């Protein structure tokens, strides 16, 4: 039976555990999560084990990245299942602080992100989101002091924002993006997929199918504006409320007029029922 990872819930216990992990000059990889772990998270852990000799997984449902009308209260919390998966994956340490540890009553500091990565995508529809993400990730980096940190590319804009923050603030952390892990029908794995009804789950892979078709058409030379309009129409016709379906430069997230403008990423966000799904694909 796999050995359960050590668990730290206070800063002193985290520091003691990290001192033990760093004995003999071990390198440390951090995988930040909000729990409700799936195979996408475990892919991050597998990559982490290749990149460092010790792996820390944080589990913290961060309230500051949720707006009042969003799903903080109902976000899946599956501690026992998560710990079983992390034991099987042979994770060394789980950092599981509570809200009071991360945000004491007198907490008064935020990290605000600017620049090209704030590109009118998630930041437009969830204006609170990146301030919360940058602040909690900055704290996790300060607490755990990892050599590398791994982020899934499903949250592509988040990956770019965190990479920029780590560079700008000289945090000394190498940020590694890990490709999206998908279900057999193409749906990007997400903890929020648990919200989908059977009918919604059957429709959800439409997003990936539309992006694959759009990417193929663009590679074949079709007009970008026409391709994106066709894809948006298909998404809406399938029953989604579309926030955006856009083609952006894969590095800067600047808008592009054609795939000749550089490496291109297609990004989508849409709601089916009350569940908001995001996805992206390279062209």
Curated annotation (Swiss-Prot):
Assembly with partners or alone: Homodimer.
Pathway this chain belongs to: Cofactor biosynthesis; (R)-pantothenate biosynthesis; (R)-pantothenate from (R)-pantoate and beta-alanine: step 1/1
Gene name, Swiss-Prot/TrEMBL: panC
Reaction catalyzed: (R)-pantoate + beta-alanine + ATP = (R)-pantothenate + AMP + diphosphate + H(+)
Name of the featured protein: Pantothenate synthetase
Transferase among keywords: no
Binding, (R)-pantoate: 65, 158
Miscellaneous section: The reaction proceeds by a bi uni uni bi ping pong mechanism.
Annotated organism of origin: Nitrobacter hamburgensis (strain DSM 10229 / NCIMB 13809 / X14)
Binding positions (beta-alanine): 65
